[in-house]
Amino acid sequence: RSIHQEELPEEPKPTEADESFDDFIYNFASDDALQRQRVKFPLPYYKGDEKTNIEERNWKHDDLFTKQHYYTLLFDKEEDMDLVGDTSLTSVQVEWIFVKTRMVKKYYFERIKGAWILEAINLRPVERNENEDFVEFFSHFAADSLFQSRRVQEPLAFVTSDPDDDFSILETSLDLNQWFAFKPALPTDRLSNINYGQRNDDNSPTKILALKGIGNGFSNILYFRRKAGEWQLYKFEDTSI
């Protein structure tokens, strides 16, 4: 081997966790040594139109959402939820949507020779348009129970695991009081999202917010649709284990 070749840093070797992006991202967020191996330094950091580079010595470990009990995912339609376990993906973005400041922080991951690598971070404002914006709506919905009660369809479709049979699903409905009794704690300051390739169109008439437990069996899905220009919760699914 020539001297020149030996100076090149070794390429990260893929591990078993790289097969599924969800497994990888959990390891990436919880293991500092792995994280440093999987960030492409100097890392381009875009803030609006400004670009800076983060050098390895200035990198601070990023827990992403692993310090929370759950994370959230956003979809426009149900069939896109099948992308979650897809092992053929090569490009995924992890997003933080900061509800109050209306900013989105996006982490760009690429799978290179089997190993997931963070290639860039981008911070930008949420785009505004004429329709009631889902992020803005959700910030009210999560924080204000009076507003929430006006935006829950009655009766609310409810899907849950059958308490007598783990493998079957019960489909029933809830009234408003039952929704308030069964609903999960909703995030008020920021939403996470993993973009596996699903569309997230601001003009979509439907939105799905999935809440997924980290290291526990929690799983809730909220289904929203725009009715006469206003967002409304029309279906709630609780299949927690």
List PLM regions with ranges:
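Surface-exposed, charged secondary-structure patches
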Residues: 45-103, 166-218
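Sec-dependent signal peptide cleavage junction
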Residues: 1-46
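A structural feature that tracks compact, well-ordered secondary-structure segments
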Residues: 24, 42-44, 107-108, 137-140, ...
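Short beta-strand edge/turn micro-motifs at domain boundaries
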Residues: 99-129, 217-241
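Surface-exposed beta-loop interaction hotspot
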Residues: 115-151, 155-170
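Short loop/beta submotifs within extracellular cysteine-rich repeat domains
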Residues: 33-37, 116-117, 148-151, 231-233
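Solvent-exposed, acidic/flexible segments
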Residues: 14-21, 98, 102, 127-134
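Acidic helix-start/capping segments at beta-turn-to-alpha-helix junctions
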Residues: 41-51, 155-164
